[in-house]
Amino acid sequence: MAARLYCQLDSSRNVLCLRPVGAESCGRPLSGPVGTLSSPSPSAVPTDHGAHLSLRGLPVCAFSSAGPCALRFTSARCMETTVNAHQILPKVLYKRTLGLPAMSTTDLEAYFKDCVFKDWEELGEEIRLKIFVLGGCRHKLVCAPFSCNFFTSA
């Protein structure tokens, strides 16, 4: 299961705001610290947190005060670039979902930092709204007991 999200950098508050694709524009954005790219521990994420928001398909960590599992976010545009031409990232995320050894956390952090922030910080793009894919998060099973294809819209 994966969820498609709008991702908007709010530089004034230094947060990354997330909202499900198709949500009303006046909906409450989800946010997490921009600088925190490590996954919160499962114990730091209460299982009932955010249940009242009814955003089906989003993992419980999306509502955590510690922020979402930022390591699981990547630009949908980057999914088929030369960086990921041989489908390494989906395999790595899937292995991590299963608890198998995969790419090191340091390498993943560097990859995601590049994907998420390169266009905004280095290329100076005016449009700061991107579509991102959330996949492989270990918290996803809390909100989505049903099975569906990896990297598809929720």
From Swiss-Prot:
Compartments (UniProt record): Host cytoplasm; Host nucleus; Host mitochondrion
Keyword Transcription among record annotations: yes
Post-translational modification: A fraction may be phosphorylated in insect cells and HepG2 cells, a human hepatoblastoma cell line. Phosphorylated in vitro by host protein kinase C or mitogen-activated protein kinase. N-acetylated in insect cells.
GO BP, one annotated term: viral genome replication
Keyword set includes Magnesium: no
Location of the region described as Mitochondrial targeting sequence in the Swiss-Prot/TrEMBL record: 68-117
Main location as per UniProt: host cell
GO cellular component: host cell mitochondrion; host cell nucleus
UniProt cross-references to Pfam families, sorted A to Z: X
Entry keywords, A to Z: Activation of host NF-kappa-B by virus, Activator, Apoptosis, Host cytoplasm, Host G2/M cell cycle arrest by virus, Host mitochondrion, Host nucleus, Host-virus interaction, Modulation of host cell cycle by virus, Transcription, Transcription regulation
Quaternary organization: May form homodimer. May interact with host CEBPA, CFLAR, CREB1, DDB1, E4F1, HBXIP, HSPD1/HSP60, NFKBIA, POLR2E and SMAD4. Interacts with host SMC5-SMC6 complex and induces its degradation. Interacts with host TRPC4AP; leading to prevent ubiquitination of TRPC4AP. Interacts with host PLSCR1; this interaction promotes ubiquitination and degradation of HBx and impairs HBx-mediated cell proliferation.
Family, similarity comment: Belongs to the orthohepadnavirus protein X family.
Described function: Multifunctional protein that plays a role in silencing host antiviral defenses and promoting viral transcription. Does not seem to be essential for HBV infection. May be directly involved in development of cirrhosis and liver cancer (hepatocellular carcinoma). Most of cytosolic activities involve modulation of cytosolic calcium. The effect on apoptosis is controversial depending on the cell types in which the studies have been conducted. May induce apoptosis by localizing in mitochondria and causing loss of mitochondrial membrane potential.
Protein name as it appears in the record: Protein X
